[in-house]
């Protein structure tokens, strides 16, 4: 365990199986926290990270979503293909980002509306799209389209980079 994400999250990636062109990689990440909530964002292979983003528009039902109480009542119900937002690039290309999993929308990152460049500069951390309470918690991998961190990096031919190793993190199961 090295970075906060590596330490407290199980990392998964949503691969859009409807796209048949292997050069199109509009993948997204789904990081499940130890408290079972999921953080949705843009994977490093997504083409939007290579372009100039002009605006990010969240769907009206996502912006007006309000949850309250310990049980987070009132959250908007999501299907895995529910569109959370539309990203428009300076060249006119639009990307539709989905929720990736079934669940209840708890929060969207409204900071992206005013500062769309945050998605490019910090896509893995403060540039997240949404926080979702998954419907399937115990068997998270049963969400269709999700693959594990290692599988994703192997599939997309991306080298795995880990954070620094600290003495207190050294265990027999990590190399």
From Swiss-Prot:
User: What the protein does?
Assistant: May regulate actin polymerization.
Annotated protein name in UniProt: Protein Abitram
Sorted alphabetically, which PANTHER family does this protein's record hold? PROTEIN ABITRAM
Which Cys-Cys disulphide bridges does the record give?
none
Q: Name one GO cellular component term.
A: nucleus
> Which InterPro entries is this protein grouped with?
Abitram, Single_hybrid_motif
- Family indicated by similarity: Belongs to the ABITRAM family.
**What Gene3D superfamilies does this protein map onto?**
2.40.50.100
């Amino acid at each position: 365990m090295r970075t906060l994400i590596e330490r407290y999250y199980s990392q998964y990636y949503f691969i859009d199986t409807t796209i048949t062109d292997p050069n199109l990689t509009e993948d997204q990440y789904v990081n499940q926290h130890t408290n079972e909530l999921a953080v949705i964002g843009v994977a490093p292979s997504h083409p939007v990270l290579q372009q100039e983003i002009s605006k990010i528009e969240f769907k009206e039902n996502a912006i007006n979503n309000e949850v309250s109480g310990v049980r987070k009542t009132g959250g908007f119900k999501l299907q895995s293909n529910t569109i959370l937002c539309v990203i428009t690039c300076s060249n006119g290309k639009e990307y539709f980002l989905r929720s990736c999993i079934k669940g209840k929308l708890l929060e969207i990152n409204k900071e992206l509306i005013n500062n769309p460049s945050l998605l490019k500069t910090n896509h893995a951390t403060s540039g997240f799209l949404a926080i979702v309470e998954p419907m399937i918690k115990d068997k998270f991998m049963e969400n269709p389209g999700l693959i594990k961190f290692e599988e994703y990096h192997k599939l997309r031919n991306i080298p795995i980079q880990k954070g620094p190793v600290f003495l207190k993190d050294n265990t027999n199961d990590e190399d």
